[in-house]
Amino acid sequence: MLQPRENPRLYGHAAAEAAFARAAASGRLPHAWLLTGPPGIGKATLAYRLARRVLSGNRPAEDPNDPSSAVFRRVAHGSEPDLFVLETEANRRTGKQRHEIVVEQARGLTAGLHETAVGRHGRVVVVDAADHLNTSTVNALLKLIEEPPAGVVVLLVCHAPGRIPRTIVSRCVRLALRPLDEATFRRAVAAAGVDADPDPALVTLARGAPGRLLRLTEADFLAHYATTLEALGGSRQALSGAADQLAGVAASSGSDLATELLTTIVRRGAEQATRGPLEPALVAVEASHLAALTGRQPLDRWLGMWDKLQRLPFELDQLHVDPRQAFYLALAELAGEERGHAAV
């Protein structure tokens, strides 16, 4: 799968790209932009398209989004000297991938921006994603946005703007991207090399975001969902096995995706309890297993689990909670068991 910096195609967001182009053509391009929308809909791909436009000037001799163009190749290969990217990196000491953008990265960025630009058309900072900034990094980035060096454009990708400080949001021009309509979604999925007729259950879960469908497919989400549902109707040993599985998903595909296996059960269980069986079912066993689960405890308690699960990725990534134990306790509560039993 192409990374956003390598992707020449953009689906469904022509209006947002055109708005940026008009601002650039006016000669009064705002220096800070916030690209918002659900994960997987193309925000980072758009950010790199906009970056290539800035780096090539307002009237380039060649299309900067043509893979054969010089600026496209430099951006794709990470060799464009006037492009600065803030994203999560591996911890140099431990080798493990960090889950936040740390202040040392922001300081390195600031130092680089005070050097003379290599090209003639300005410099670009891409932050992918602003959701991963910690408090210290937010403060450093805010200073950059408030007092930008001449010719610098900052493009912030953001999945949930309500979770980042208003001081940053208020200083940016916002491009709000929407989920793709079905026809555009299918074109984007086909272009990415995925089955032209993907599983309807995955399409339902993707919610108009091609990148999300790719991620769910690669993580084998539906298979894990089925085994998690079945384990919730089984013994403590079954729950323990499911906790091992979820810890494995967290390690390979991210704690957010592992937690989503549980939040999907909560959300769809609550919907089924109030509206009846859901179509399409995500897996064959879904309706009967959800009915059994929601029948064991009051619906308000079931819904109360949602808030707890929303905090779980943070606890796993930032507080370094033991994932197997955390997932076991969450599974036990969903199954209607008393809290406090350690994983077996």
Where are these regions (language model features)?
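Conserved beta-strand segments of the P-loop GTPase G domain that flank and frequently precede/overlap
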Residues: L34, L86-E87, V126-A129, L155
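Charged, glycine-rich active-site and insertion segments that engage polyanionic ligands
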Residues: M1-R53, R59-P64, S68-R74, A150-V152, ...
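Conserved D-loop-proximal element of ABC-family nucleotide-binding domains
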Residues: T135-S136, R166
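AAA+ P-loop NTPase catalytic core and its hallmark functional loops
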Residues: L10, G78-G122, S136
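Loop/turn-to-beta-strand initiation segments
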Residues: G119-V124, P149-L155
